[in-house]
Regions:
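Generic signature of intrinsically disordered, low-complexity, basic-rich segments
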Residues: 9-13, 21, 35, 75-76
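Bacterial Sec-dependent signal peptides at the C-terminal "C-region" and cleavage site
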Residues: 18-31
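Divalent metal-dependent phosphoesterase catalytic cores across multiple superfamilies
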Residues: 28-184
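N-terminal secretory signal peptides and thylakoid transit peptides that target proteins
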Residues: 1-15
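Residue-level detector of intrinsically disordered, flexible termini
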Residues: 12-16, 24, 79, 84
Length: 184
């Protein structure tokens, strides 16, 4: 049987191996972007982009946050870009309504501030008129200890036109009453 100390030692050794391969160095590049990125409310010519940037120290405002939307993952062909800011009263969340996009097209997006980049997200505008095929992913009720989060990974790897998240789980169990004891 493996004990807690062995697991923690294994994690420490694994983290050292990751930094050799550059994975942790990449993560350090997005310092401050603690909640990833998201997109939503797509129309045929626009989409909302979201992220959260947490500046260090006792800062009230984060300015000069660059947002970029590109046709390619490498951001060699920029479709739209701009600058925005956020502040403590918004919990440092960033929300941008990107307009002037082409319909039915996949885009890649990110946020940049002081040399730190967010993760790269992927979004798609809605098509205009009738389409031969429209692939929809649907998710709901995400109870972390009950798992099955690999389904989100499968959706991310699929060529979906839209992902609709219907809501989240209502955690109605009393303490000590979870279906899975790992939840405690």
């Amino acid at each position: 049987m493996i004990n807690r100390r062995q697991v923690l030692q294994g994690i420490g050794a694994g983290a050292g191996a990751l930094s050799v391969n550059g994975v942790l160095a990449t993560s350090a590049g997005n310092r401050g972007f603690t909640h990833g990125v998201a997109s939503g409310d797509p129309l045929s010519d626009r989409v909302i982009l979201w992220s959260r940037y947490v500046p260090g120290g006792n800062v009230a405002r984060a300015e000069n946050i660059i947002w970029q939307v590109a046709y390619d993952r490498a951001f060699g062909d920029i479709a739209a870009s701009g600058m925005t800011s956020t502040h403590r009263h918004r919990d440092f969340t960033i929300k941008v309504d990107v307009t002037g996009l082409k319909s039915g097209r996949r885009y890649f997006y990110r946020f940049v501030i002081d040399g730190h980049r967010s993760e790269t997200g992927s979004t798609k505008t809605l098509p205009v008129g009738a389409v031969d095929r429209f692939r929809l992913g649907v998710a709901s009720c995400s109870n972390y200890p009950q798992g099955y989060f690999h389904a989100y990974d499968d959706m991310a790897k699929s060529d979906l036109d839209l992902v609709l998240h219907l809501g989240d789980y209502i955690y109605e169990y009393a303490r000590g009453r979870y279906v899975n004891p790992i939840a405690e």
